[in-house]
């Protein structure tokens, strides 16, 4: 920093972390200011509530806005430093003894006014050096913002894979137990099929576990590359204007290549083999489900012999999709207090649906049309995120890493065992059993379709 600028003025425009003039300064709750890049790099791995670097007061990380006035003052300070530098004897044009205040964008050099009009540079694009430096710095900041969004996206994906790894073995064991439980209800001659299906599921589970670790390693490596590139761009932003102008093009090109080929979370599907005779056994408890006339709508309608319900949003209804998620709920006319019951739902090839049973006190939606909490709701749902569809069950809310069922999905309700089980009818395979359900009879079937 130049001694010609007031020391007090310099101190007020200096980031306490990097000790350079502010670039894109943000002011946090306690009133202290930092460069946004410094704040990001130092607090990314810390929870939302953190401590100020200077006063140690607790502050929020959310909704950081640029301090425009501070940014303008820091820009003026840099311009003053640039002019002092260009006005020095060493920086004068050796040919014309004029100040080199013009920047040539073709050969990235500083020229005096007379040199910029020479035959060599006449047809090149020129601009004032002070203006070019700030414009280039703004381009860097814009690129840094895009890069940081990728840093955060990659970190979210890394967190997803880390969580999956920590829970994967337990999930596989739950799936194995569910299959064993189904075979215990089947005749003894299914023993070889059971053994084969369990061995295949174990092998698939181990393969996926290995792939998860590889995916996590790729994301961790990408995180270091992204953060390193971001720090490099930040360092370039802090360079004196002349150095920034001369080195700008190369670093921008390198940063763009880093944004390519971002690793994504794996699409996990732990497919179990078919269980022979599963549907025949469940059909012993088959019941007819009907909808009260006032609760039927265009998204949930009755099929054929009323032994199954069709659910889903027809793709032809796309013009009716709204920006605000809207849920369409319907309850079955039947109620259950004891016994075992089985029915099927035809979901076709749709997504953003859910169905199951609920306690008598579960209200569905509030006055704003939003779905209430999952307590008292025992359901299977399918949602689409980007290009992937995910299955989940409620009570508790749990992701199910099985292929998305198409056409028919079965529900088996056992009031005495306090369980709700879901079955992929086409694959003759169990999806999940919700154990230890906190039933509060009478129970009612419930169907939901969501337009997103």
From Swiss-Prot:
One GO molecular-function entry: ubiquitin protein ligase activity
Zinc finger (B box-type): 88-129
Keyword Signal appears in the UniProt entry: no
A cellular component annotation (GO) from this entry: cytoplasm
Domain called B30.2/SPRY: residue spans: 269-452
Zinc-finger among keywords: yes
Zn finger limits (RING-type): 15-56
InterPro entries membership: B30.2/SPRY, B30.2/SPRY_sf, Butyrophylin_SPRY, ConA-like_dom_sf, SPRY_dom, TRIM/RBCC, Znf_B-box, Znf_RING
Protein name: Tripartite motif-containing protein 49D
UniProt record similarity statement: Belongs to the TRIM/RBCC family.
GO annotation, biological process: innate immune response; regulation of gene expression
Binding residues for Zn(2+): 93, 96, 115, 121
Lineage: Eukaryota, Metazoa, Chordata, Craniata, Vertebrata
Taxonomic source organism: Homo sapiens (Human)
Keywords for this protein: Metal-binding, Zinc, Zinc-finger
Top-level taxon of the source organism: Eukaryota
């Amino acid at each position: 920093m130049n001694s010609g600028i007031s020391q007090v003025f310099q101190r007020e425009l200096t980031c306490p972390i990097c000790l350079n003039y502010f670039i894109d300064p943000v002011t946090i709750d306690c009133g202290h200011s930092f460069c946004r890049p410094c704040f990001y790099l130092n607090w990314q791995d810390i929870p939302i509530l953190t401590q100020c670097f200077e006063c140690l007061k607790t502050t929020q990380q959310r909704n950081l806005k640029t301090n425009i006035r501070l940014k303008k003052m820091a820009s003026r300070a840099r311009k003053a430093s640039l002019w002092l530098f260009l006005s020095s004897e060493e920086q004068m044009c050796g040919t014309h003894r004029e100040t080199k205040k013009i920047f040539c964008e073709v050969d990235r050099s500083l020229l005096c006014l007379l040199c910029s009009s020479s035959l060599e540079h006449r047809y090149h694009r020129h601009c004032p050096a002070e203006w070019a430096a700030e414009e280039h710095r703004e381009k860097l900041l814009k690129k840094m913002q895009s890069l940081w969004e990728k840093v955060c996206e990659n970190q979210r994906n890394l967190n997803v894979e880390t969580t999956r790894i920590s829970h994967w073995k337990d999930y596989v064991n739950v799936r194995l137990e569910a299959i064993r439980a189904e075979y215990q209800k089947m005749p003894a001659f299914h023993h070889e099929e059971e053994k084969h299906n369990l061995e295949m599921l174990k092998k698939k589970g181990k393969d996926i576990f290995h792939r998860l670790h590889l995916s996590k390693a790729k994301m961790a490596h990408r995180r270091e590359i992204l953060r390193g590139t971001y720090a490099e761009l930040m360092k370039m932003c802090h360079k004196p204007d002349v150095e920034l102008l001369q080195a700008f093009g190369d670093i921008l090109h390198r940063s763009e290549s880093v944004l390519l080929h971002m690793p994504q979370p794996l699409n996990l599907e732990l497919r179990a083999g078919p269980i022979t005779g599963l549907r025949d056994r469940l059909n012993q408890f088959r019941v007819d489900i009907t909808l009260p006339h006032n609760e039927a709508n265009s998204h949930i309608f009755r099929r054929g012999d009323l032994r199954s319900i069709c659910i889903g949003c027809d793709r032809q209804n796309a013009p009716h999709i709204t920006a605000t998620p809207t849920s369409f709920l319907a309850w079955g006319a039947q109620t259950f207090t004891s016994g075992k019951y089985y029915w099927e739902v035809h979901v076709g090839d749709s997504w953003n649906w859910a169905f199951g049973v609920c306690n008598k006190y579960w209200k569905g939606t509030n006055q704003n049309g939003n779905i209430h909490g999952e307590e008292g709701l025992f359901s299977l749902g399918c949602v689409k995120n980007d290009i992937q569809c995910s299955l989940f069950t409620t009570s508790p809310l749990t992701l199910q890493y099985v292929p998305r069922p198409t056409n028919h999905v079965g529900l088996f309700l056992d009031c005495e065992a306090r369980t709700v089980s879901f079955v992929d009818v086409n694959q003759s395979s169990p999806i999940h059993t919700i154990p230890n359900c906190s039933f509060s009879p009478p129970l009612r079937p419930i169907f939901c379709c969501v337009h997103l």
